[in-house]
A protein has these predicted regions:
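Auxiliary tRNA-acceptor-end handling modules of aminoacyl-tRNA synthetases
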Residues: 1-154, 172, 181, 187-266
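Zn2+-dependent metallopeptidase catalytic core
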Residues: 153-181
Length: 274
């Protein structure tokens, strides 16, 4: 399988040439150096297998010399990708087609058998497989809740706030007739599993130099149905610290009993995060 994983057979990293198209970006990543491309690691779990590959690109005559942040020497560029193979479930999950009036993450699907249909789109929304214990009741406990695990690297100062925020989603699910649809646990310090195992939905603690958002996905779905199989959420340290700083500076939150929850009581960690 080396010819598949150690090449661009699964995912094209280099941009294709567009005849007549504008060359707005002078940076060229170069050619794939197959002799330097390698597996970083291979991880096997009960329901998924991950191949992490480091692709190396060589460009002896670059026209752009990079930057002091992401790339110091453009003559050699490393790109790391993870290829994941996930076991698909066999169940009675019923896909739900997208309604363009409501925003969802979707799997785009085109019905190739509808030759006369001007809009042959059958996009499926991404959603969890939540089932009622008592389907005949308007409101019922769920058979299997969505369980989120707070990663054990998360500072203790923030764990209760994170748990409270996630569990607040139960109010929305109750409106849909699903009781206790979301559960939150803390990953034990001696856990024999890690976030790479798709069976665990993990709220991961991270510290990036310039994150695009305070929290972001991804989730993993069955492309045939749209069922969400698992998800990890990256929680950025800088978002929490900035939130507390802005709150102290601008006194954004009210101390009223019915007002938003305030986190000014939190003591920020003094550890330097790299």
């Amino acid at each position: 399988v080396d010819n598949v994983f150690l090449s661009e057979a699964l995912y094209q990293i280099t941009r294709g040439f567009v005849p007549g198209g504008p060359n707005k970006n002078p940076f060229k990543i170069g050619r794939l150096a197959k002799e330097r491309t390698k597996y970083v690691s291979v991880k096997n779990y009960p329901e998924n297998t991950d191949f992490i590959v480091q692709y190396v690109y060589s460009n002896p005559t670059p026209t752009n010399w990079g930057s002091d942040v992401g790339l110091t020497d453009p003559r050699s560029v490393n790109v790391t990708l993870q290829h994941s193979f996930i076991q698909m479930p066999e169940n009675d999950y019923v896909p739900r087609f997208e309604d363009p009036r409501v925003g969802y993450f979707v799997t785009q699907t085109t019905d190739m058998t509808s030759a006369d249909d001007p809009t042959p789109y059958r996009d499926m929304i991404h959603r969890w497989n939540l089932e009622k214990k008592n389907p005949e009741q308007a409101r019922s406990e769920v058979k299997e809740p969505i369980t989120w695990w707070i990663e054990n690297t998360t500072p203790h100062e923030f764990r209760d706030a994170i748990k409270e925020g996630v569990l607040a989603w139960n109010k929305a699910f109750e409106k849909a007739g699903l009781i206790n649809a979301v559960d939150v646990q803390v990953q034990p310090d001696d856990a024999d599993w890690d976030a790479g195992d798709i069976r665990y939905n993990v709220l991961r603690w991270t510290s990036s130099p310039n994150p695009p958002f305070g929290g972001y996905g991804p989730s993993f779905v069955n492309p045939r149905t749209g069922q969400i199989l698992g998800a990890d959420i990256m929680l950025e340290f800088v978002y929490f610290t900035n939130r507390v700083k802005y709150e102290k500076i601008f006194d954004t939150f009210s101390a009223a009993d019915n007002g938003p929850v305030s986190y000014t009581h939190l003591t920020l960690p003094t550890t330097s995060y790299v």
